[in-house]
């Protein structure tokens, strides 16, 4: 049975259920932002340098997997600069005119945030080049031989672009960002701090051991950690006394099919098919997807990245292969010759 990737509790993508709660949990300053110490230090220098000069910072590109806080950092950058934030996304900018309208409404020192900037349409991207470099755009009026280009000045602004696929950016666009930061997955200890902060904001009684239990199942992603915290809260309020202990957390996550390594039903189905149906592989992703009743894109884009990062699946020229860790996680004996990478190697 096909699964909507956004319905998974361990999906790093923003879901409808995250909504207003996700907004309420966002940090509002670099001091409040947990994790990514190197990125925070670098951004602090970029922001403070611009404030000292009384100018606008260089354009900033934030890259990394979904759910790590790129949008939160864009909001923080604007707040730290004391500037207004204008938000849009790459898919929303289908025409150059869409971008021109947004740029013409900017005032000096505004921060323009474009999420999924790698998906911006080519005509809009080409207009963005000139705006980023010279703070102007050329608007074409008319068609055919009679068309004329009218230059329009744009107020000096800072573009913050966010992408989960930095390699998909064109060279000319990437080169126009003065500062690029890559965000890494969080360590369990950092996620535990995120959970403690979120629990305080939401008024949740969270035991220390319970925070650690949820953190290690959160795939290194704060958005997943906060979502699991809300699901465990529901369980604690309905089936316990409202206090989240380690045992309550374990019982709740078992109900939601999230195991001790953060794998859910779909992840385990992929591993089970790979080991039991295909003897560990190699097997092509399309064949593997048919075996679990999913789209190939779901297996490749939703399940596989975490399974590879966790050291349970290896990509080879001949197809996907289950590692020794995948066999042992399913309670099976690895066949002779299975490689044995450590977790997250």
From Swiss-Prot:
Q: Where are the transmembrane segments?
A: none
UniProt subcellular location: Cytoplasm
Record carries keyword DNA repair: yes
Per the record, which residues fall in region Small ATPAse domain (RuvB-S)? 187-257
Record InterPro entries = AAA+_ATPase (IPR003593), AAA_lid_4 (IPR041445), DNA_helicase_Holl-junc_RuvB (IPR004605), P-loop_NTPase (IPR027417), RuvB-like_N (IPR008824), RuvB_C (IPR008823), WH-like_DNA-bd_sf (IPR036388), WH_DNA-bd_sf (IPR036390)
Which keywords are on file for this protein? ATP-binding, Cytoplasm, DNA damage, DNA recombination, DNA repair, DNA-binding, Hydrolase, Nucleotide-binding
The organism's place on the tree of life at top rank = Bacteria
- Residue segments, region Large ATPase domain (RuvB-L): 1-186
Kindly list the biological process annotations in GO that this record carries: DNA recombination; DNA repair
What the protein does?
The RuvA-RuvB-RuvC complex processes Holliday junction (HJ) DNA during genetic recombination and DNA repair, while the RuvA-RuvB complex plays an important role in the rescue of blocked DNA replication forks via replication fork reversal (RFR). RuvA specifically binds to HJ cruciform DNA, conferring on it an open structure. The RuvB hexamer acts as an ATP-dependent pump, pulling dsDNA into and through the RuvAB complex. RuvB forms 2 homohexamers on either side of HJ DNA bound by 1 or 2 RuvA tetramers; 4 subunits per hexamer contact DNA at a time.
What's said on domains?
Has 3 domains, the large (RuvB-L) and small ATPase (RuvB-S) domains and the C-terminal head (RuvB-H) domain. The head domain binds DNA, while the ATPase domains jointly bind ATP, ADP or are empty depending on the state of the subunit in the translocation cycle. During a single DNA translocation step the structure of each domain remains the same, but their relative positions change.
Q: Subunit info?
A: Homohexamer. Forms an RuvA(8)-RuvB(12)-Holliday junction (HJ) complex. HJ DNA is sandwiched between 2 RuvA tetramers; dsDNA enters through RuvA and exits via RuvB. An RuvB hexamer assembles on each DNA strand where it exits the tetramer. Each RuvB hexamer is contacted by two RuvA subunits (via domain III) on 2 adjacent RuvB subunits; this complex drives branch migration. In the full resolvosome a probable DNA-RuvA(4)-RuvB(12)-RuvC(2) complex forms which resolves the HJ.
Give the PANTHER family listed for this entry: HOLLIDAY JUNCTION BRANCH MIGRATION COMPLEX SUBUNIT RUVB (PTHR42848:SF1), PTHR42848
Name assigned to this protein:
Holliday junction branch migration complex subunit RuvB
Lineage of source species = Bacteria, Bacillati, Actinomycetota, Actinomycetes, Mycobacteriales
